[in-house]
Design a protein with these regions (language model features):
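Bacterial Sec-dependent N-terminal signal peptides
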Residues: 1-24, 276
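Solvent-exposed loop and edge beta-strand segments that line ligand/cofactor-binding
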Residues: 299, 349-361, 408-424, 470-492, ...
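Long, well-ordered core segments of solenoidal/helical folds
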Residues: 326-337, 384-402, 449-477, 514-534, ...
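Structural helix-adjacent loops and short alpha-helical linkers that scaffold large soluble proteins
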Residues: 372-385, 434-458, 502-520, 557-573, ...
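CBM-like, beta-strand-rich accessory domains located in the C-terminal region of large
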Residues: 404, 425, 746-932
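Active-site lining segments of carbohydrate-active enzymes
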Residues: 410-539, 552, 654
Length: 932
């Protein structure tokens, strides 16, 4: 007892000295201390461990970080193992746990060594919670002493801790085993984690386990991979000296951190936890008492339809352009989507037959609305009424490809169930904006018009959004994701459109508050998934729908709250915006991992507005850059956006005069004698030469020699995922030399179980190896490791181990790929180690240009030698020097899909370098790429 008292006094003194700290949570953790009270007296670890050293360290951390920011936990087996336990019946261990003020402990199997009744006696003296969720202790003396979980307040956050224990049936007395029923840890953890995260609003969910990291019947690694909503696993039982945080991806593709701290208390584990932000939801709750969001739509930052002077100021010379476009639609015939067009999706996978007429109707609606706002004479009103009447009486606004989420599982709309998708949300926003501007005019014709429009938006958008039973079909909310689903661009896209409908049309304050609260919680899910580095893993082609739609949502909420709900000063939001500029190569080419296209045209107003909001000169200059006209060697004046997005059409007017003024200044520089290229290049001087996105694991390297290389790590369950861990693309002077094909036109196979039968999704059609005959596998469990980057003035490098992206059948222990860019030389080195050899390795490279293998003669007359390959594309000539033991070959992929041919032409070529089937189990493949 003297030792316990000594520790208690030490702790008390240190607590008095502690100071509050504004940092995230520190989890101090021990496990399997096994009654090792004193430092080790001999053996392999003399002098190490002991509770006095532990207490001193724990108290030093509590002082440094603030006790309220530190959580001390024990992952089981605190008893049994030395004479302290046998002579004092485990009482001193309980005294020590109390004295050191542990926050929570879980049970280990050795806690049962002296029987259940004896364990109950000891636990009755423990002044802290004991957790174990996968056993039922009802009817035993442990009933009431052990909880399945506990919620702690730490670092100003709610932390849920779930306890889990290994199957003890084979390691405890038979009589004890018969009393206890073991339940699957993953099933139990999944249930409680959902309850803690979703229902109880915990900011962090920790599984405190005594399962074992490795070598046990069910491990922490298996637990992480089989659950959702668990953030951290603090484990014990296997005595694993895990000297770093292991990262395992869960069913949602989210990383779960696993830690375990060896044995005997030789060290104290220290884990720093960064809480997920709840950025928007927290702000909304702060503003809720003030009722800053009004019901009357007066917040909308555009003049009323009747305010002709206001519209003249907004539009200026753009009015004529809008009116002229509207005239073209005065005789437009509103298109009907027949039932068979919906059914065509499930019959053949064809979606355009349904989408094209709906898209045409949406463009017509936008064009007519903008024309009437510009002219203000009523000329377009009847045609608007016809369109809105037609759309309001449609059975659904959802696209046929998304209707199988109905309970029927069919692509024909079921009027008994309303979902919200990209199509319905966007059309709902259009209808809401039109109603906002013209409802008084409609009422003069017949009040029934406004009533029908309001009822349609309520039925199609407002009611389904508030119906919590629809969380699963409306998966994009992020509240109930299926295994493997991730939060992607649907989230901000749908939420922006839906919240615009509510803020313009909802007349019930309680319903509006519910929608605002739900949208803030939902969009937080997207911000968390995007990661703090700001990269868009879906690629630049989706930036406008991902970060761009997040901007729309934030701008709507900012305007509707009179600037109170604002996040444009948050670094992550700015970084997400600048990603679009930094992923740009030249001449419309962009970095195009995943489903993104390699060539894009941009919407300058979206980029400019976003940049203006976050204070990014880089983005505003990039917007102006995209107004350049290389044929005329000048810059085009910005035009209002006429498309099928009502909000963005209006937003394109927000800074149109400011953009116009800047374009005039650029053209004046050209008129004054500065070259067009000089003016154009001046708009890209703020772009950094090298960019590293550490969480998403994207790396961009560009140099003064005109080389731009992009490479990636990550995992194979990213949004719009391709199996492409470790791939790269290379451009020289804006010419694509090593490419990523992208994706063809979407069909029902694109987002189905057949996705990875599509050639462009597979790793063997990326710039990647086939290892020992095996391709990369899809899923969050297949990921990169040990990623390192270095940027120097003379050269840049990225290194990563991609072996984890391949099935175990590859027998690959490690495959470390190294990219080294030095001037006009890119060296790719693959260093590998296999357990066994079953097939050849194949190194693949995908190119657009012509390929010349050894024995060929280039058009310039160069005879290609052994160990060389020449690639020529649009005047750029490159030499690949490869290991001579590899056999080169070419396969041409003929292209017919317009989405691919519009970028690449009629074909791409894959260069494959194949090893012997008896190649060594370890070795190195080096490829040196130079201009030729």
């Amino acid at each position: 007892m003297a030792i316990a008292k000594k520790i208690f006094l030490l702790v008390s003194v240190c607590i008095l000295a502690s100071v509050a700290s504004a940092q995230n949570l520190t989890i101090l953790h021990l496990n399997d201390t096994h009654s090792h009270i004193d430092p080790e007296r001999g053996g392999l670890y003399p002098g190490r461990g002991g509770v006095i050293e532990q207490a001193a360290y724990i108290d030093s951390v509590r002082v440094a970080d603030g006790k309220e920011n530190v959580m001390l936990v024990h992952a089981g087996d605190f008893g049994q193992g030395t004479s302290y336990f046998t002579e004092m019946n485990g009482d001193i261990e309980i005294d020590i746990l109390n004295a050191m003020e542990y926050d929570v402990v879980c049970l280990g199997n050795h806690e049962f060594d002296n029987g259940i009744d004896e364990l109950a006696r000891r636990l009755a003296n423990l002044n802290l919670p004991v957790v174990c969720a996968n056993y039922n202790f009802a009817g035993t003396t442990l009933e009431g002493l052990i909880k399945p979980y506990v919620i702690l307040e730490k670092a100003g956050k709610k932390v849920g801790v779930i306890g889990l224990l290994t199957d003890v049936s084979s390691v405890v007395d038979r009589n004890i085993a018969d009393l206890l029923k073991y339940n699957n840890p993953a099933e139990v953890a999944d249930k409680y984690a959902y309850m803690l995260k979703v229902e109880q609003g915990c900011d962090l969910v920790v599984c405190l386990t005594h399962l074992g990291y490795e070598g046990e019947s069910y491990t922490d690694v298996e637990l992480a991979a089989a659950t959702r909503n668990v953030d951290v696993i603090v484990g014990g039982h296997s005595h694993t000296d895990l000297n770093k945080v292991d990262k395992v991806y869960n069913l949602d593709g989210e990383p779960v951190g696993i830690v375990s701290n060896w044995k005997w208390g030789l060290t104290v584990g220290n884990l720093k936890v960064n809480f997920k932000q709840n950025l928007l939801y927290g702000k909304y709750l702060d503003l809720l008492p003030e009722k800053v969001f009004s019901l009357d739509g007066s917040w909308f930052p555009y003049p009323a339809y009747e305010d002709r002077e206001g519209w003249n100021k907004v539009l200026g010379k753009s009015a004529v352009h809008l009116i002229n476009n509207g005239v073209k639609y005065l005789d437009y015939k509103w298109q009907i989507v027949p039932a068979t067009s919906y059914l065509e999706y499930e019959r053949t996978g064809e979606r355009k037959i349904m989408e094209n007429p709906q898209s045409a109707n949406r463009v017509a609606l936008n064009t007519l609305m903008l024309a009437e706002l510009a002219e203000g004479k009523g000329r377009f009103i009847d045609q608007l009424v016809d369109g809105l009447w037609h759309l309001s009486n449609s059975p659904t606004w959802v696209l046929s490809a998304h209707l199988p989420r109905q309970k029927t599982g069919r692509s024909l709309p079921d009027p008994r169930e309303q979902l919200i998708d990209l199509g319905s949300g966007a059309l709902g926003a259009q209808v809401a904006v039109a109603w906002h501007f013209f409802n008084k005019t409609f009422d003069k014709i017949d009040p029934v018009i406004s009533y029908v429009i309001q009822e349609a938006v309520k039925k199609q958008i407002l009611d389904p959004y508030l119906n919590t039973d629809e969380y699963r079909p409306n998966w994009w909310l992020g509240f109930e994701l299926k295994p493997g689903q991730v939060v992607n661009n649907w989230n901000p896209w749908c939420n922006a459109d839906v919240i615009l409908c509510f803020l313009l049309m909802e007349k019930n304050q309680e319903r509006l508050d519910q929608a605002l609260r739900q949208s803030a919680r939902s969009v937080d899910k997207f911000i968390e998934y995007i990661k703090t580095d700001g990269a868009c893993e879906e690629g630049p082609a989706y930036w406008g729908h991902a970060a761009g739609k997040l901007y729309d949502y934030l701008q709507i909420m900012n305007d509707a709250s009179n600037g109170r709900f604002t996040f444009f000063d948050v670094k992550q939001i700015k970084d997400m915006g600048e990603y679009i500029s930094r992923s740009y190569v030249k001449d419309g080419w962009v970095v195009n991992f995943a489903d993104a296209s390699a060539k894009l045209s941009f919407t300058p107003s979206v980029i400019y507005n976003y940049g203006k909001a976050v204070g990014s000169e880089e983005m505003m200059e990039f917007a102006l850059y995209n107004l350049a006209d290389s044929k005329k060697n000048n810059f085009k004046e910005p035009r209002p956006l006429i498309w099928n997005d009502a909000y963005r059409a209006l937003e394109s007017l927000r800074y149109i005069r400011e953009m116009d003024s800047k374009v005039d200044a650029l053209n004046e520089r050209i008129s004054s004698g500065e070259s067009y290229d000089s003016v154009l290049n001046s708009l890209r001087t703020s772009v950094p030469s090298h960019v590293w996105y550490p969480e998403t694991e994207f790396c961009y390297m560009r140099n003064n020699d005109g080389w731009f290389m992009a490479a990636k790590g990550g995992h194979n369950n990213e949004s719009h995922n391709h199996n492409d861990i470790g791939t790269f693309t290379l451009y020289v002077d804006g010419i694509p030399m090593f490419v990523d094909a992208g994706v063809g036109t979407y069909t029902k196979h694109t987002f189905s179980k057949d996705r990875y039968t599509i050639w462009s999704m597979r790793s063997d059609w990326h710039n990647l190896p086939v290892i020992n005959g095996i391709y990369q596998h899809d899923g969050a469990a297949y990921h990169s490791a040990d990623v390192e980057v270095s940027f120097k003035k003379s050269a840049s490098r990225m290194t990563l181990d991609i072996s984890g992206a391949y099935d175990e059948e590859s027998d690959c222990k490690s495959w470390v790929r190294d990219y080294h860019l030095d001037g006009k030389v890119l060296t790719i080195t693959d260093t590998y180690s296999l357990k066994a050899r079953g097939a050849a390795d194949v190194e693949n490279f995908l190119v657009q240009g012509s390929v010349y293998l050894p024995g060929d003669v280039t058009p310039e007359g160069y005879p290609v030698k052994k160990g060389e390959t020449v690639v020529i594309n649009q005047g750029v000539r490159m030499m690949i020097k490869y290991p001579v033991m590899l056999i080169p070959s070419i396969e041409t992929k003929e292209l017919s899909d317009p989405r691919l041919t519009n970028v690449w032409g009629d074909s791409l070529r894959r260069i494959s370098y194949t090893s012997s089937e008896n190649a060594p189990l370890s070795g190195r493949y080096v490829f040196k790429i130079t201009e030729f």
